[in-house]
Amino acid sequence: MADYSFVTLWRFRAPLADVWDLIYRSEQWPSWWRGVERVEKIEPGDSEGVGGVQRYTWKSKLPYRLAFRMRLTRVEPMSVIEGEAIGELTGSGRWQLTQDGDATSVRYDWNVSTMKAWMNLLAPVARPLFKWNHDVVMNWGAEGLAKRLGVERLNVEES
């Protein structure tokens, strides 16, 4: 397995509630986030979605797809969404949203291991390419969110 830790920071001139709604409703991501091919509900969760499982299929600039299931483990409305991934990527993801004046800041922490043998084999030399690919997909998300809300994207930072 190859381990990866990514931090993505987005900032939009938009109310927190509007940004939260788009991120929280991940089943709608394919309609505005380029690269998200499909989100399928596998198991329902509680009233906030905790315990629910969805299957995600992603396609990026590189010629491969990644699919994994994500179990929602924590929701603090208008603040935090956390989940555990199992599949071709295994690990955890955490969205954190904060309001700062007329802007909303979004931080996404994605700590995963690749499960595809070819990715693990190539990781020592392809790691920078995989990182670039992740950053491209996250940038598509920021672009799509800003466009869907009709708001200004103030910045995107990836690691």
Features from the language model and the residues they span:
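Hydrophobic ligand-binding cavity/cleft-lining segments
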Residues: 1-46, 158-159
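Well-ordered beta-strand positions in beta-sheet-rich domains
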Residues: 7-11, 67-69, 92-94, 109
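Beta-strand/loop substructures that line and gate deep hydrophobic ligand-binding cavities in soluble
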Residues: 84-139, 156-158
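Structural motif
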Residues: 13, 75-77, 100
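Glycine-rich portal/gate segments that line the openings of hydrophobic small-molecule binding cavities
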Residues: 31, 40-92, 105, 139-158
